[in-house]
Amino acid sequence: MIDAATLYAREERDLYIETVKGGKFFINHPEFDIEVMAHAMAHQCRYTGHVSSFYSVAEHSVLVSKLMEHLKLGDPFEGLMHDGAEAFISDIAAPWKVLLPDYKKVEAMIEGPLRKHFNLPATLTSGCKEADWLALFLEAKQLMVSKADAWTAPPGIKDRAEEIKNLPQFRVFALEPAAARAYFLQRYKDLSNARA
């Protein structure tokens, strides 16, 4: 696999994906358009689609941001953008990531520039990781047959998720893509205004 330094050193802009707007996202020279990201994230179903209703990466990201805000786990904008790289590399279920170590390298190639572009910490904060874990269990309780009862988690996550699962601000709506896109963009606007 080509390493990030070699990839970014390439002068030619031949490694790209076409975006929903007809533009090009150059893998070795990434630039970020929030509307393009929102569209892609809204059209990707989490859990490899194995949920009772369509549930997007965009809606998940809003939930993580709300968890960070209401539970005082850190900057909710980080929560909103924590899976932003998936707009360009797709969401892959965690067990596959164990078997695909190069996926993490590819993710880092997009995530580093994305975090810099949006003025986020270089790596995920512990608060964002906690909110992501909580979201996982809140989502599973509402969208999966198993309710995640047999899943493992860091200490305290399952108990905390159980405590907050019925709070209205953490409700999972299972929005269709167009609504999920709008939901994400509204949250982005609100949080961007608060950061200004």
Map each language-model feature to its residues.
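Metal-dependent phosphohydrolase cores
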Residues: 1-196
